[in-house]
């Protein structure tokens, strides 16, 4: 428990958007930012358990900050932060795929969105205990290295078949359009169209 508290306090000492906002609140209210952060986390947890739109809030938490950090990583000259956020997005995509197929079952568990949010926060935490890096190195990378040759071969075959299919469909559509245009094009006549005669009464 002390290790978790020390990590929490180290996080509060870092410079980022959240800690700057907590620092401003601390200056206004006189309440220490660790208590403010703990209160905000407790409210967030309660809302994820009982609030309306917990799914949306959980997805926003799992997407907004990582997207912001990814753009900053792209713009920075360092490659290390790029690797961290690419790894996060690989884990996020894999988690989304698993969740898509298991959502009908997991949706009924009352703590599902709180657990999902905790998992996503674990995956984006900075430092050596980053969940995305742990999952990548212990689960995803070994599976990828074991099966990537077969996956590359299957992807190559599928892309070749898709290109052949697209070329065949394009050829058939162009031929159908050419035949249709030949049928629709009227024969040219030298006589002008007859004028309409009105019957005066």
Curated annotation (Swiss-Prot):
Its main location: endoplasmic reticulum. InterPro entries: TB2_DP1_HVA22. It is found in: Endoplasmic reticulum membrane; Cytoplasmic vesicle, Clathrin-coated vesicle membrane. Expressed in the inner segment of rod photoreceptors and outer plexiform layer of the retina (at protein level). Expressed in liver, but not detected in brain, muscle, kidney, retinal cone photoreceptors or retinal ganglion cells (at protein level). Highly expressed in the ganglion cell layer of the retina and in liver, and also detected at low levels in kidney and testis. Isoform 1: Expressed in the retina. Isoform 2: Expressed in liver. The keyword Endoplasmic reticulum applies. The keyword Membrane applies. Disruption phenotype: Viable, however mice develop progressive deterioration in retinal response, and male mice are sterile. Progressive retinal rod dysfunction first evident from one month of age progressing to almost undetectable scotopic response at one year of age. Progressive degeneration of photopic response by retinal cone receptors first evident at one year of age. Defective retinal morphology with significant thinning of the outer nuclear layer and reduced rows of nuclei. Accumulation of vacuole-like structures at the apical inner segment of the retina. It is a multi-pass membrane protein. GO terms for biological process: detection of light stimulus involved in visual perception; regulation of intracellular transport. It comes from the Eukaryota. It holds the Pfam family TB2_DP1_HVA22. GO terms for cellular component: apical part of cell; clathrin-coated vesicle membrane; endoplasmic reticulum membrane; photoreceptor inner segment; rod spherule. The chain crosses the membrane at residues 36-56, 89-109, 117-137. Keywords: Cytoplasmic vesicle, Endoplasmic reticulum, Membrane, Transmembrane, Transmembrane helix. Required for correct function and survival of retinal photoreceptors. Required for retinal development. In rod photoreceptors, facilitates stability and/or trafficking of guanylate cyclases and is required to maintain endoplasmic reticulum and mitochondrial homeostasis. May play a role in clathrin-coated intracellular vesicle trafficking of proteins from the endoplasmic reticulum to the retinal rod plasma membrane. Belongs to the DP1 family. Interacts with STX3. Interacts with clathrin. This is Receptor expression-enhancing protein 6. It comes from Mus musculus. The lineage of its organism: Eukaryota, Metazoa, Chordata, Craniata, Vertebrata.
């Amino acid at each position: 428990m002390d290790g978790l508290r020390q990590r929490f306090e180290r996080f509060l000492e870092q410079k980022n958007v959240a800690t700057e906002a907590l620092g401003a609140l601390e200056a206004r209210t006189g309440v220490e930012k660790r208590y403010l952060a703990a209160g905000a986390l407790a409210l967030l947890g309660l809302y994820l358990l009982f609030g309306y739109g917990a799914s949306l809030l959980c997805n926003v938490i799992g997407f907004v900050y990582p997207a912001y950090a990814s753009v900053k990583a792209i713009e920075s000259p360092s490659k290390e932060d790029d690797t961290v956020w690419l790894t996060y997005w690989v884990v996020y995509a894999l988690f989304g795929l698993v969740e898509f197929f298991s959502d009908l079952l997991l949706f009924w568990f009352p703590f599902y969105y709180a657990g999902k949010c905790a998992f996503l926060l674990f995956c984006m935490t900075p430092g050596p205990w980053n969940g995305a890096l742990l999952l990548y190195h212990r689960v995803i990378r070994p599976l990828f290295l074991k099966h990537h040759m077969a996956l590359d071969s299957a992807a190559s075959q599928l892309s070749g078949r898709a290109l052949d299919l697209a070329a065949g469909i394009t050829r058939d559509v162009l031929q159908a359009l050419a035949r249709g245009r030949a049928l629709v094009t009227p024969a040219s006549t030298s006589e002008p169209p007859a004028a309409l005669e009105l019957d005066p009464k």
